[in-house]
Amino acid sequence: MKASIISKLESLKERHEELEALLGEPSVINDQDKFRAYSKEYAQLEDVVKCFARWNWLNNNIEETQLLLDDPDMKEMAELEIEESKAEIENAEQQLQILLLPKDPNDEYNAYLEIRAGTGGDEAGIFAGDLFRMYSRYAESKRWRVEVLNANESEQGGYKEIIVKVNGEGVYGQLKFESGGHRVQRVPKTESQGRIHTSACTVAVMPELPENEMPEINPSDLRIDTYRSSGAGGQHVNTTDSAVRITHIPTGIVVECQDERSQHKNKAKALSVLASRIAQAEQERQAQAQADTRRNLLGSGDRSDKIRTYNYPQGRVTDHRINLTVYRLDEVMNGKIDELIQPIITEYQADQLAMLSEQN
C-alpha cells in the first residue's frame, strides 16, 4: 500500500482516538449538538479504523511468522500462514480503498421519491402503484418511515403520480440509483386476448437538503396557487383550499402538496421539495457533462433513461446499466431489492476507484 495512503489512515486513526476521548468529556456530553456531531464522525470512522487495525495486525503477523521459516518443524505451517495472511492483506487493502473513497455528503440525508406513470395508460398507473408498494416494503425492512406528500390516483388503481418523503439513516445513499425509467412487461388484468403489454414509469430520487444547503429561491420567481385537496376519482375531501401548487417560473418546475390539512404546512413541504428539485436539476446538468466523457451510473439526468425491466411472464428483473438479471420477480416486488441495489453501488465504487487510478 502507498505511503501516502498509510499516512492518511494513521491520521484517521488518531482522529478516531481523539473523538473517543472527546466523547467522554463532561463539556461535550452536556452539549447535545456537539455530542451528536462527534458521535456521527466517530461512527463514520469506525469501519476504516477497524480495517486498518486488521491490516496492521496481518503485516506484523507475517513478520513474526517469517522468523519460524528457519525451523524445519515449523516451516511448512509458517509458509501456509504467511500465504493466508498475504491473501487477507490484499482483501483488506481493497476494502480500505473503498472506505477511503470520497463520500457523497447527501448520502446520509432523507430522500424525496417521485413515481410518475409514463406510457401505457391505466397499466402504467397500476405499475406506479406496484413500484410504490415495492419501495414502501423495502423502507419498512430498513425501518425507514414513508410519508406521502402528494398522490394523484388513477381510475383503475395505482397512481398517475405519487411523491413521498422517506425518512431514515442513509436513505438517499441507498435509493439514489433508482432514478430513471422503469419498464414493465406483462398481461394487464384488463387485457382479454392475453397479450403482453409494455408500460413504463419514471422514478426520481432527490436528497432532502438541510436549510443551510438549500438553493436561494427568489419569492418573486414563484407562483403559488391553492386548491381543495382531492381523493380518488377527483372528489374533494377538504372544504378549505389547503392544497398548494408552487411553480418556479425560471425553470418551470411545479410541485404540489396536499397531505396536510394546513395550507401553511403544505406550502412549507412543497417549498422543501422545490428546493431539492432545483438543486437536483443543477446536479443533473453537471452529471450530463460528466456522462459525455465517461460512463455515469447515476444517469445523465434524462428520466427517460431505461434502467430496469420487470418481465412478469419470465419472472425476471433486468438492470440494463450493469446487465444484471435476477429471476426472483415476486420477491423484488415485495421489497427485497437489496440484490439489485448493492451490485449497482459496488459497480459505482469500482468506477470511482478507476477514476482515482487514472488521476494518480
From Swiss-Prot:
Please provide, alphabetically and separated by semicolons, the GO molecular function terms listed in this UniProt record.
translation release factor activity, codon specific
The entry's comment on post-translational modification says: Methylated by PrmC. Methylation increases the termination efficiency of RF1.
- The UniProt entry lists the main location of this chain as cytoplasm
**Listed name of the protein:** Peptide chain release factor 1
- What is the name of the gene encoding this protein? prfA
The disulfide bonds in this chain are none
Pfam families assigned: PCRF, RF-1
Record's function text: Peptide chain release factor 1 directs the termination of translation in response to the peptide chain termination codons UAG and UAA.
Which keywords does UniProt give here? Cytoplasm, Methylation, Protein biosynthesis
Keyword check for Transit peptide: no
What family does the Swiss-Prot or TrEMBL record give for this protein? Answer: Belongs to the prokaryotic/mitochondrial release factor family.
Matching entries from PANTHER family are given as: LD18447P
* GO cellular component terms attached to this protein's record: cytoplasm
Report the residues modified as N5-methylglutamine. 235
**Organism whose genome encodes this protein:** Histophilus somni (strain 129Pt)
